[in-house]
From Swiss-Prot:
Gene: Klc1
Localization, UniProt: Cell projection, Growth cone; Cytoplasmic vesicle; Cytoplasm, Cytoskeleton
Organism: Rattus norvegicus (Rat)
Protein name: Kinesin light chain 1
InterPro entries: Kinesin_light, Kinesin_light_repeat, TPR-like_helical_dom_sf, TPR_rpt
PTM: Phosphorylation at Ser-460 by ERK inhibits interaction with CLSTN1 and localization to cytoplasmic vesicles.
Length: 560
C-alpha cells in the first residue's frame, strides 16, 4: 500500500511539472477561492458553536462543543496560512511576469543596437572604399598635373606677370602695354610734370592753358588716383561748364577737360559715356588744332583703347592706324613713340587673327627700338616677347624659341658678361640637364647653373614670362627636365620680386601709414589707379588695363 501511495504522489508531481505558468496561476486562483469559501464556512460553524455553548450548562455536552470549537479554530489558522501562501505565489507570479516583460524589452533593444551597429559597419566600409578611390584619383591627377599645366601654359604663354600684381599673376594677359611706360610708376610724377607739359603744349598748339584749368586738372588727377570719383567728376563738369561759358564749346581747353572726364568715366566702366566725350574732344581738336596735330593722335589712341576694351577691335583698328599716320608725319617713321603705336596696332590685329600684319608691325617696332634705344632697352625684349607670342599662335615654334633664347641670352649678358663655356645663360643649362637626365639625376640647386636667376637680379616681368613661355615650349617638345629648370627659375624670380614689393610696402607703411591704408582699401575693391600723363603735344593719355575677349587681360598703353 505504501508503494501505491508513493506511485500516486510521483504521478501527481509529474503532472505538476508539466503545468504551464498560466495553468499554475489559474489553479492557484481556484485554490484561493476554495480556501476563502472554506474559511467562511468554518467561521459560520464557529459562530454557531459559540452561541450553542452559551446556552448549554457545563456538562459533558458543553465539553464536546468546546472541543469542536478548538478544532475549527485550528482549521481556520491553517486556512489563513494557505491563503497567505497562495497570495505570495500570485505576487511572485506577477513579479516574474514583469521581469519577463523587461527582459523582452532589453532583447528588443539589443536586436536594434545590433542592427544599427551592422549599418554603421557597412557605412564605414563604404566610406573607406570611397576614400581609397579618392586617393587613387588624386594619385592619377598628380601624374597628369604637369601635362595639364603644359596645356594651360599654351593658352597663356603670352602672360606677362608683374611682381606687384600678385592677384593677376595666374591670369592670361596679352602684354600690349609692356612696351609702354610702366603703369606702376608713381602717379605723382605725372602731376609734377603738368606745368612743363602744358607750357610745351602752349608753344606747339598756339594756345595757353589757363592757370585755373591747370589747377583743376591736377586736382582731378589727384582725386581720381585716390578713387574719389564722386569728387573728381563734379570738378570736371564744373570746369567744363565754366570753360564753355568763357571760351565757347569749340576750344582746345574744353577738349582737354573732355578728355580728362572721359578717362575718369573709363575707370568707372562707363564706356559709352567715355566714348561720347572722346568723340566730342576729337572733333574739337581736329577743328581747332588741325587733323594732323599730336593731340589729335593722342585722342585717337585713347578712343582706340576704349573700343579695344569693349572688344570692338574692327572699330579700333582704323583709329589706331590714323594715330600712327599722324605720329609718323609729325615725329618721323623711326621715332620710339611710333614704335609704341605700332605695338598697339599689332595687338589689335592679333585679336582679329591678322598674323601677317602683326608680324610686320612687331618687326618694324623692334627695328625702331633697336636702332633708337639700343639692344639693351627693355622695350626690345618686350617686343621680341610679343613677336614670339605671335609666332606661337601660328605654330611657328622654332622662330618663337629663337626669340625667347635671344631675350634670355641678352639678359644674362647684361648681368654677367659675354657667354662662354663657363658663363652660360639659363636655357643652355636647361638643355644640358635635359641631355644628361638619363645619365645622372641629381638634386642640384639652381646655384650651379649660373647666378642671375638665383640672385634674381634679372627679375623683370618680361624675363619671367619668357622663362615660362620657353618652358611651355620645351614641354611641347617633350623636354620635361629642361622645362622644369626654366619653370623653377621663373618661380624663384617671381618670388624675389614679390619679396621686394612686400619690403617696399612695409617701408611705405612706416613712412606714411594713412596714405598706404587708403591705397590698400582701394586695391581691395579692385579699383585701378588712374595715371594721367601729358605729352609734349598737350594730349592727356592714360595707361589702362583692358579686358580682351573676357579672358585675357591686356594693358593698352596710351602712347604720345
Amino acid at each position: 500500500m505504501h508503494d501505491n501511495m508513493s506511485t500516486m504522489v510521483y504521478m501527481k508531481e509529474e503532472k505538476l511539472e508539466k503545468l504551464t505558468q498560466d495553468e499554475i496561476i489559474s489553479k492557484t486562483k481556484q485554490v484561493i477561492q476554495g480556501l476563502e469559501a472554506l474559511k467562511n464556512e468554518h467561521n459560520s460553524i464557529l459562530q454557531s458553536l459559540l452561541e450553542t455553548l452559551k446556552c448549554l450548562k457545563k456538562d459533558d455536552e458543553s465539553n464536546l462543543v468546546e472541543e469542536k470549537s478548538s478544532m475549527i479554530r485550528k482549521s481556520l489558522e491553517m486556512l489563513e496560512l494557505g491563503l497567505s501562501e497562495a497570495q505570495v505565489m500570485m505576487a511572485l507570479s506577477n513579479h516574474l511576469n514583469a521581469v519577463e516583460s523587461e527582459k523582452q524589452k532589453l532583447r528588443a533593444q539589443v536586436r536594434r543596437l545590433c542592427q544599427e551597429n551592422q549599418w554603421l559597419r557597412d557605412e564605414l566600409a563604404n566610406t573607406q572604399q570611397k576614400l581609397q578611390k579618392s586617393e587613387q584619383s588624386v594619385a592619377q591627377l598628380e601624374e597628369e598635373k604637369k601635362h595639364l599645366e603644359f596645356m594651360n601654359q599654351l593658352k597663356k604663354y603670352d602672360d606677362d606677370i608683374s611682381p606687384s600684381e600678385d592677384k593677376d599673376s595666374d591670369s592670361s594677359k596679352e602684354p600690349l602695354d609692356d612696351l609702354f611706360p610702366n603703369d606702376e610708376d608713381d602717379p605723382g610724377q605725372g602731376i609734377q610734370q603738368q606745368h612743363s607739359s602744358a607750357a610745351a603744349a602752349a608753344q606747339q598748339g598756339g594756345y595757353e592753358i589757363p592757370a585755373r584749368l591747370r589747377t583743376l586738372h591736377n586736382l582731378v588727377i589727384q582725386y581720381a588716383s585716390q578713387g574719389r570719383y564722386e569728387v573728381a567728376v563734379p570738378l570736371c563738369k564744373q570746369a567744363l561748364e565754366d570753360l564753355e561759358k568763357t571760351s565757347g564749346h569749340d576750344h582746345p581747353d574744353v577738349a582737354t577737360m573732355l578728355n580728362i572726364l572721359a578717362l575718369v568715366y573709363r575707370d568707372q566702366n562707363k564706356y559709352k559715356d567715355a566714348a561720347n566725350l572722346l568723340n566730342d574732344a576729337l572733333a574739337i581738336r581736329e577743328k581747332t588744332l588741325g587733323r594732323d596735330h599730336p593731340a589729335v593722335a593722342a585722342t585717337l589712341n585713347n578712343l582706340a583703347v576704349l573700343y579695344g576694351k569693349r572688344g570692338k577691335y574692327k572699330e579700333a583698328e582704323p583709329l589706331c592706324k590714323r594715330a600712327l599716320e599722324i605720329r609718323e608725319k609729325v615725329l618721323g617713321k623711326d621715332h620710339p613713340d611710333v614704335a609704341k603705336q605700332l605695338n598697339n596696332l599689332a595687338l589689335l590685329c592679333q585679336n582679329q587673327g591678322k598674323y601677317e600684319e602683326v608680324e610686320y608691325y612687331y618687326q618694324r617696332a623692334l627695328e625702331i627700338y633697336q636702332t633708337k634705344l639700343g639692344p639693351d632697352d627693355p622695350n626690345v625684349a618686350k617686343t621680341k616677347n610679343n613677336l614670339a607670342s605671335c609666332y606661337l599662335k601660328q605654330g611657328k615654334f622654332k622662330q618663337a624659341e629663337t626669340l625667347y633664347k635671344e631675350i634670355l641670352t641678352r639678359a644674362h649678358e647684361r648681368e654677367f658678361g659675354s657667354v662662354d663655356d663657363e658663363n652660360k645663360p639659363i636655357w643652355m643649362h636647361a638643355e644640358e640637364r635635359e641631355e644628361c637626365k638619363g645619365k645622372q639625376k641629381d638634386g642640384s640647386s639652381f646655384g650651379e647653373y649660373g647666378g642671375w636667376y638665383k640672385a634674381c637680379k634679372v627679375d623683370s616681368p618680361t624675363v619671367t614670362t619668357t622663362l615660362k613661355n620657353l618652358g611651355a615650349l620645351y614641354r611641347r617638345q617633350g623636354k620635361f627636365e629642361a622645362a622644369e629648370t626654366l619653370e623653377e627659375a621663373a618661380l624663384r624670380s617671381r618670388k624675389q620680386g614679390l619679396d621686394n614689393v612686400h619690403k617696399q610696402r612695409v617701408a611705405e607703411v612706416l613712412n606714411d601709414p594713412e596714405n598706404v591704408e587708403k591705397r590698400r582699401s582701394r586695391e581691395s575693391l579692385n579699383v585701378d589707379v588712374v595715371k594721367y600723363e601729358s605729352g609734349p603735344d598737350g594730349g592727356e593719355e592714360v595707361s589702362m588695363s583692358v579686358e580682351w575677349n573676357g579672358m585675357r587681360k591686356m594693358k593698352l598703353g596710351l602712347v604720345k
